[in-house]
Amino acid sequence: MSVRISSRADITLDAVRRVAWEGEGVDLAPEALHRMDEMHASFMALVAARLAEDPGALIYGTTTAPGDGAAVALTPEAQARRPTRLWTAHTFGEPLPDRVVRAIVLARLANFVEGNAAVRSEVASAVAGLLDAPLPTVPAEGNGGSGEILALGRLFYDLSARMDLKPKERMALINGSPCAAALVADIALAGRARLALAEGVFALAVEAARAPLEAYSEDLDGLWDDEHETAALRALRTLLDGGAPVRQAHQGAVSFRILPRVLGQVRRVQTEAEHAAEVSLRSVTDNPVYVLPDDDRPLGTVISTGGYHNARAPAAMDGMGIVWADLCQIAQRLTDKLLQHPSTAGLLARDEWTMKPLHMVATGWAEEARAYAGPTLLSLGGFGQNDVPSMGFLAWRRAEATGRCLDAALAIVAALGAQALHAAGQDPPPALAALVEEIRAAFPPVDGVRPLGPDGNALTAAFGRRVFTGPVAAASA
């Protein structure tokens, strides 16, 4: 299977899922290939016309050097000496997962397919062809430059070494913001599964404690009048339908009652992350960007832009990290609640030897999440023309780490909830039965003293496989 790309509108979040997570290839439509060659020829005609009019015309990266060299046109001798390979492959460190690198390759095509990068079709085909072989290593760390030229230099260096590229094509490979688009898409895809997982695990905790269901009443849908909180209320009602008929008589603890509000906020932030990903993936972000010909400009025009700096993606990833960290705090509170609640304490914490120490593990994961989450502010680093770095990689690393904390924190609550039902001889609500079965397969019921760390690892890994679906994504789960 391949994803057909006819225009940049075809580069969607679902396309990222298929190409980056499932491992499908990319098929560039014939009309897109023709359009790219046509626009490349048009751009070259524009450059020739500008130089004929003014031999010192400044077209960034084509008649000039990059960065601080943008102010002066290159002499013929300097043009002859310019490197034929990419010159920015300098970053190093822990590598990005293959699923993210594949997403970057896909996102790179957005600038190409409608001609705005002025690359030939053979360059776009070579980029798409990278998906059919093992990909270069791209570091997740050390990306502190303006735009994404460091990571993209690592990704496309070998391609530049084996192809005879025009100056604009070399610039087009490393400019723009495909990395930020891919990174926020990766977090958004993971967020969908983590939201469903969190709702299921928290509903299991509600059921184990036999907490009152009035906090999720249908009456609140219209009273709160918020689409995301209403969706959370409905999800919890569905998950808890058919549960134990006898519940706690007085109101539940705050950690139970605020679940729809907190989960509603997660849904709200998830929606923004998905929207940020969709817009980022299809945006033309090249610098300089080729504005296509029209009646007033028959050869088009070329302008320098800041498209390589995606400010929305880091904010969206920060938002996801913050709500995931909040869920870790809720998970820690529910861990303590289940170990102390009158309905479950005797089932889970009747002694000091079995499950009670898990409350300390939950605190550890919650604190790690707190350390990772927060706003990724603009860097004070920079040099010369490149005086403001882009922050997408750091925002992704923080959100990714927070998400891993959430998987572990949810595993603890899930293990306690399933154990409480086991010890009470209580069946879960029908909508939670499959989840409970999955929990017990990785974290069997505890009937005596044993190390629970390996079980926690196994359940966290199982939850990771829920989040990272598809053969490529699963390899990094």
Task: Identify the residue ranges that each predicted region occupies.
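FAD-binding core of FAD-dependent oxidoreductases
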Residues: 58-82, 87-112, 137-159, 165-182, ...
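Acidic, glycine-rich active-site loops and adjacent beta-strand->loop/helix elements
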Residues: 65-66, 110-111, 131, 144, ...
